[in-house]
Amino acid sequence: MPVRIPSTLPAVEELKKENIFVIEEQRASSQDIRPLRIAVLNLMPLKLMTETDLLRLISNTPLQIELDLVLPEGHEWTNTPKEHLEEFYKSFNDIKKNNYDGFIVTGAPVEMQDFETVDYWPQLQEIFDWSRTHVTSTIHICWAALAGLYHHYGIRKHVLAEKLSGVFEHRVLEKSNPLFRGFDDVFYVPHSRHSEVRKEDILKVPDLSIVSESAESGVYIIMARNGREIYITGHSEYSPLTLDCEYHRDLSRGMNPHVPTHYYIDDNPAKGPLVRWRSHANLLFSNWLNYFVYQETPYDIRDIK
C-alpha cells in the first residue's frame, strides 16, 4: 500500500525516482475505499486447484475483495464435480451486465487446437470484448494470453516442437513499471505450455509492450492500454507441486515427458521441487491489485468504461 506523506517533503521526489509509491495528502484525503469486485473466468480442468492458487495470491493484500467465479456456457466440464460448479460458479450471462474492478482469465488445456475449433470460442470472444468496457484491468494467463492477443491484435500462436515445462529465469524490461515494484533483477516463473507467441510479431503492434521476458522461455508479460490488458504467458500462480502433478500425469499416460527444466532439486524428481517463484508471484498479483486495479478504478463501479 502507498505511504501517505506531505507533498512538500524532500523525500517525495527521491522516492518517486526509486519507483517507490507515495501518495500525497491531497489525493489521499479524496480517496474512498470499497471492496474490489474481481471475477475469475476459470477454464482450467482442475478448477478447485486453480481457485486455491489464485485466491492464495489475491488475498495476500490489505484490500477487501468480492469474488465471482465464472464459466462460459455450453461446455461440459468433466474434471470438477457438477455440484461444485452449480454452487459456486456463475455463467457469463449471469454477470455480463456487471462491472468489475479486476478480471482474471485462466489458461485452458486446448493449446493444440485452432482457436476457432474450441467449442466456447465465440463466447470467449464476446467475453474479451465485454472486458474492455466493463473491467478496469484484465489479466490473461497462459492460453488465455495467446487467445486474447489473437482476438484483439491478430497475433498468431505457434505450436512448439515439444512442451515447455519448468521454472525459468526472467528479467524486467520496463523497470519503472509499477507491476514490478519490489522485484529482484532476476526472478523465476513456472511455464507449462505447448504454444508461444513470438517477440517479432508483438513488436509489430504499436499498442503492445513487452515488459518482461526470459532467454529460455521467451516473452513473459505483454501490456496494452496502460495496463488495462495484461497478458502473462507463464503460471506464476502455480503451487509448488503443480508441475510435479502434470509431469507424473503425463508419465502415467505414456507420453514420455521431459523432466521439467530447473524445477526439481538437482533435476531429480525424487528430490522434489525447489520453489523459487513464490515471493514474486505474490508481488505480481499484489502490485496488479494495487496499482492497476485499486488505484485506477472509479469509486462508483458503474463508471467503468
Q: What positions do the PLM features span?
A:
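N-terminal beta-loop-helix "entrance" segment that forms/cooperates
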Residues: 73-86
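Amide-donor transfer/coupling interface in amidating biosynthetic enzymes
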Residues: 1-74, 89, 95, 99, ...
